[in-house]
C-alpha cells in the first residue's frame, strides 16, 4: 500500500491596497464637499424651538431627545451624516454650526477609501494505490521454519520428543532431555512468580 500526495499549488494570499475606489466625494471639515445623499440642519436654538413646538407632546419620543440636554441632542442629530452604502464612510462636523457651549460635540473628519483584495487558491491531488504482493509473501512463507507448539503436558517426564523438534532428528531421547525439562520447569515457575508479584 502506497500513499502519494501531490500539492501543485499552495494557498497564496496577495494583498493589494487600491485607492480612490469610493464613488463619493471625500468629506472635509468645511462641509462644502458632501455626498449626494448627505443632509445638514443648522443646529441653532431658534431652529430647535421651531422643531420642538411643531410637534405635539404625544409625538415626541426617545429619538427627539437622545441626551439630557435637548439642545445638545438636536446638535448631535443635525450634525449626523446620512449616507448610503455606495457613498462610502464619511463623518463631518462643521465648526461654524457648533453651539456656543461646545458640550457633547467632537470634531471628526474620517474618510475610508482603501481596500484589501485577497486571493487564495488550493490545488491538490491525492492518489492511493493498494497493490498486494502475493508472490513475495509466498516466498517468505516457505523460508520460515515451523516449530512445534508446546503441549500442555510437555513438562511431564513421560513426554517424548519426536523428530520434528530438531532439524535432523538427532535429539530424540538424548541425555540432555531431562535436564532441559527441569530447567524449563524452573523457568516457568519463576515467570509465574514474577507475574504474581506484579
UniProtKB/Swiss-Prot annotation:
Protein residues bound to Mg(2+): 92
Record's subcellular location: Host cytoplasm
Annotated organism of origin: Rotavirus A (strain RVA/Cow/United States/WC3/1981/G6P7[5])
Coiled-coil region(s): none
Feature: compositional bias, Polar residues: 91-104
Protein name according to UniProt: Non-structural protein 5
Chief localization: host cell
One matching Pfam family: Rota_NS26
Keyword Phosphoprotein: yes
Post-translational modification (record): O-glycosylated. Hyperphosphorylated on serine residues, when in dimeric form. Phosphorylation by host CK1 is required for the hyperphosphorylation of NSP5 dimer.
Phosphoserine sites (modified residues): 67, 154, 156, 164, 166
GO cellular component, one term: host cell cytoplasm
Cofactor: Mg(2+)
Source organism phylogeny: Viruses, Riboviria, Orthornavirae, Duplornaviricota, Resentoviricetes
Top-level taxon of the source organism: Viruses
Keyword presence, Transcription regulation: no
HAMAP family linked: ROTA_NSP5
InterPro entries given in the database record: Rotavirus_A/C_NSP5
Residue ranges of the region described as Disordered: 16-37, 53-72, 85-104, 130-167
Family, as annotated: Belongs to the rotavirus NSP5 family.
Known partners and oligomeric status: Homodimer. Interacts with VP1. Interacts with VP2. Interacts with NSP2; this interaction leads to up-regulation of NSP5 hyperphosphorylation and formation of virus factories. Interacts with NSP6. Participates in the selective exclusion of host proteins from stress granules (SG) and P bodies (PB). Also participates in the sequestration of these remodeled organelles in viral factories.
Described purpose of this protein according to its UniProt entry: Plays an essential role in the viral genome replication. Participates, together with NSP2, in the formation of viral factories (viroplasms), which are large inclusions in the host cytoplasm where replication intermediates are assembled and viral RNA replication takes place. Orchestrates the recruitment of viroplasmic proteins such as capsid proteins to these factories. Participates in the selective exclusion of host proteins from stress granules (SG) and P bodies (PB). Also participates in the sequestration of these remodeled organelles in viral factories.
